[in-house]
C-alpha cells in the first residue's frame, strides 16, 4: 500500500474499474471458465447460457479493458485471461466463496 495520495487515487480508480467489470455475473463466469483454459466462444457457450452474440459482446468488453486476449488459429479465435493479476484475483474469490 502506498502513502502517496496521488498513487493511491490512481490505483483505487484502476481497481474500481476492474471490480465494475467483474460485478456483471456473466463476465465473472466467463473469466472463471478462462481461468485454466483458453476457449473459443462456442466452447464458452457450452458453459454459459447466453446467446453467442451477448457472449461475444461481454468478451469484447473484457478485451477492451485488457482482461482477456485472443489467439487466432485459421478462423478460430481462442480467448484467454491476459492479466495474471486477474487470475490471482479469481483464485482468491474461488477459494473464499466457492
Regions found by a protein language model. Name each.
Residues 3, 15, 80-98:
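Conserved segment of winged-helix/HTH DNA-binding domains
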Amino acid at each position: 500500500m502506498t502513502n502517496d495520495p496521488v498513487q493511491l487515487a490512481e490505483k483505487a480508480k484502476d481497481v474500481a474499474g476492474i471490480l465494475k467489470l467483474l460485478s456483471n455475473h456473466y463476465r465473472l463466469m466467463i473469466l472463471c471458465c478462462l481461468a485454466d483454459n483458453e476457449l473459443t466462444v462456442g466452447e464458452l457457450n457450452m458453459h454459459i447460457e447466453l446467446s453467442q452474440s451477448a457472449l461475444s459482446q461481454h468478451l469484447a468488453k473484457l478485451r477492451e479493458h485488457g482482461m482477456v486476449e485472443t489467439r487466432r488459429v485459421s478462423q478460430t479465435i481462442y480467448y484467454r485471461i491476459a492479466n495474471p493479476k486477474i487470475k490471482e484475483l479469481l483464485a482468491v474469490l474461488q477459494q473464499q466463496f466457492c
